[in-house]
Amino acid sequence: MVSRFALLLTLPLAVACAPVAGGGDALSSPAPDAEGALFVAGKFGNTLSKVDLASGEAVKTVDSCANPHELATSPDEKHVALACYGGQTVDIFSTADLSRVASIDLGENARPHGIVWHANGDLYATAEGRKSVFWIRDPLGEAETFEFGSGQEGTHMLAVAPDGLHAWTTNLGSRTVSLIDLKTRRAPQSVEVGEEPEGIWLSDDGDTLWVSARGSNAAFKLDPQTLEVRQRIETGNFPLRITVRPQGDYAVTSNLSDGGLSVIDTATGKVVRNIRVSGPDQAEAKTQLTILFSPNGERIYVAETMANTIAEVDFASGRVLRRLPGTGGGDGLAIIE
């Protein structure tokens, strides 16, 4: 069982083959077929790092901001935005050399956490300390900010509609999920979804909202417009993140207490396999948090925050291929090709 100390650090088909954790013990071994770069927010070291995926090496690390958490890359992949959870800004860095190009102030006690860089070019971020969501229009230009209250405690992670008209948030303290209208400013709609809902992901077609509730050991399929729960799916223990494969065929939860991943068929809502990353015996030592698919859906990256590593997992086999550097307590992840 993961200790309260480790948990507090997280706040501020049948199986075709048995899941394995084989390999992956060597840090930064080369992967000739891997391309692009992985960006890692070091929330304990207050850093931002760039990892070259071909070599598996960290090619640059810079000072970022206080307690940085989630990351998002721009549509053109030239910039990466960082939510400064220990402060009140969203900071933007060049993906080429990690130079800071902008710092957008969201106001006193903002504590931004979840962040989305939308295909429309705008940024969206939760401001947990203000119980709100910010829409940042033209972040690399005038950076106009518009604030929308959630009225909920612990507004932590978010998803944004393809048309940019609505956002959805998980609110840890209130045990709710909220639907926020980003145009008309009508009162947000909030419903309770399990215990401590944290992970959230909207399907590409906007038809299904996925939520993982870490205190319920479950994932939920919701109607995005009514917030009605369509299906509850039992997962591994403490699923604090959920993501959907770019192909849309599987949803995956990051299970902190198991040191593993639950793979859910999005069509049936059934768990079809479980992938062991570090396993229950190393779960506390590793403290597995954020998960992120490669753009082609072939690999999934798993932040092991207390170990300062990022596990690279082959999605088809469930094999841990290698462990990449996750300097400074790596948590938030972003990727470019």
Protein language model regions, located:
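Positively charged n-region of N-terminal signal peptides that target proteins for export
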Residues: M1-F5
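Bacterial N-terminal signal peptides
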Residues: A6-A16
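Predominantly soluble domains enriched in secretory-pathway, periplasmic, or organellar proteins
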Residues: C17-E337
